[in-house]
């Protein structure tokens, strides 16, 4: 069960980035692409935040998991939340024709999404002897 939520995150990223976005880009003109994709990204990153929170809860409840799992779950929450928060600024830069700002924000979003993918792929292989501390009085 530990790997369930990271697996969902990996699957969602692959589906969105490798299938949905390219298909929309190829089939819609730029105006309709923007209208269609804008409502999807906030939902996508919000979903990744929620899945990452569930992953963190799972890690917390299973003391046999390592500190690395905790780091992956917390990092996933932070990175997805940052991507979510910068969406309005990215859209504003696009609307205002500010290509430089758009390029920077888009690069951050893409980079963080790739890091999210790598971290969550690494989740099942990061079992080590470095385990989370458990309370001695429970």
Can you name each region flagged by the protein language model?
Residues 65-93:
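Mid-chain, well-packed structural core segment of small domains
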Residues 92-103:
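Acidic interhelical loop/turn segments
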Residues 128-134:
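Conserved small/polar residues in nucleotide/adenosyl-binding loops
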Residues 49-58, 112-126:
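Hydrophobic alpha-helical transmembrane segments in multi-pass integral membrane proteins
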